């Protein structure tokens, strides 16, 4: 019997093989999977977010996938509330919550809580977008560095979504986003969390995996998927969903701002930058099981160590 019910966090950078490992573990573990991915929440964004197929989602219970229209917004605070509700229900069913993804802010918010942040303000965001169109996102990143140096250090100047959010929070609250997050009230999760980190030992290997996956997405019809979103008059680059890595670059290609080769190059580069940020977050994690997806027996390694950790948690 578990003193506190267990929960497994399967974390890793993009293209590390988290979904495949999660499904392999689900074959052996009585669990339900909770997606920790800020883009997989959106309906109609399947190829570019590498969602598991509907057949796999029916075979292995998944949560927090396809819960919003791309015109809607999602937040770390809402994720925390949704995840806690799901984890409680899954544990009551006698199963283990298996949280899988690469949105590290969501994992952090779930673990430590988060200061109440203001909801997105369309007028403020539109004003920031107009300023970015005139001055460029690099200029706005420089302004962010003056207002919130800590946030600017963590946010790359090619990450307009996070630059916009940090500036928006400052305009709405008068306080830096980094300060609000740092002051978030730590609240211990009522779970025995087992952390599993999946990442190649060599960054060059991850870079290669990222490029292969994006080119496979293109062959699978990614541009056609984005065209379907592009044709909707209610969607634009002002929406968080469309600013997701890969989608933003494809959108600009459809607006004739990029050539096809440039679009692919920019998308791959942006994905590598995202992976770099994810790895920075992961380096802060302690007491985690580390697995290299390039090892032939990495599934067995992960299972053996996870099984041992679950025994110790009981």
Curated annotation (Swiss-Prot):
Region (Interaction with substrate tRNA): 37-40, 161-165
UniProt xrefs under Pfam families: IPPT
GO terms (BP aspect): tRNA modification
Residues the record lists as binding substrate: 14-19
Domain of life, per lineage: Bacteria
Catalyzed reaction equations: adenosine(37) in tRNA + dimethylallyl diphosphate = N(6)-dimethylallyladenosine(37) in tRNA + diphosphate
HAMAP family, per the entry: IPP_trans
Protein's name in the database: tRNA dimethylallyltransferase
Lineage start: Bacteria, Pseudomonadati, Pseudomonadota, Gammaproteobacteria, Chromatiales
């Amino acid at each position: 019997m578990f003193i506190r019910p267990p929960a497994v966090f399967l974390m890793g950078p993009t293209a590390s093989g988290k979904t495949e490992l999660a499904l392999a573990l689900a074959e052996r573990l009585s669990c339900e999977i909770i997606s920790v991915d800020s883009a997989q929440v959106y309906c109609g964004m399947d190829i570019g977010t590498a969602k598991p197929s509907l057949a796999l989602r029916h075979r292995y219970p998944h949560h927090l996938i396809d819960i919003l229209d791309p015109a809607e917004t999602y937040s770390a605070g809402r994720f925390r509330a949704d995840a806690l509700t799901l984890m409680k229900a899954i544990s009551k069913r006698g199963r283990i919550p298996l949280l899988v993804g690469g949105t590290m802010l969501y994992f952090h918010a779930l673990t430590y809580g988060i200061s109440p942040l203001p909801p997105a303000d369309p007028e403020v965001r539109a004003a920031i977008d107009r300023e970015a169109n005139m001055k460029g996102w690099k200029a706005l990143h420089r302004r962010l560095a003056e207002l919130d140096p800590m946030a600017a250090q963590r946010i790359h100047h090619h990450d307009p979504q996070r630059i916009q959010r940090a500036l928006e929070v400052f305009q709405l609250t008068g306080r830096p986003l980094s300060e609000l997050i740092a002051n978030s009230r730590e609240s211990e999760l009522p779970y025995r969390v087992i952390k599993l980190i999946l990442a190649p030992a060599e960054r060059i290997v991850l870079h290669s995996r990222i490029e292969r996956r994006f080119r496979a997405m293109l062959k699978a019809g990614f541009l056609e998927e984005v065209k379907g979103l592009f044709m909707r008059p209610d969607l634009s680059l002002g929406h968080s969903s469309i600013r997701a890595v890969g989608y933003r670059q494809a959108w600009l290609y459809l607006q004739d701002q990029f050539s096809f080769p440039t679009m692919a190059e920019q998308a791959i580069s942006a994905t590598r930058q995202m992976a770099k940020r994810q790895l920075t977050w992961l380096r802060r994690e302690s007491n985690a099981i580390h697995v290299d997806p390039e090892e032939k027996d990495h599934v067995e390694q992960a299972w053996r160590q996870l099984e041992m950790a679950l025994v110790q948690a009981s």
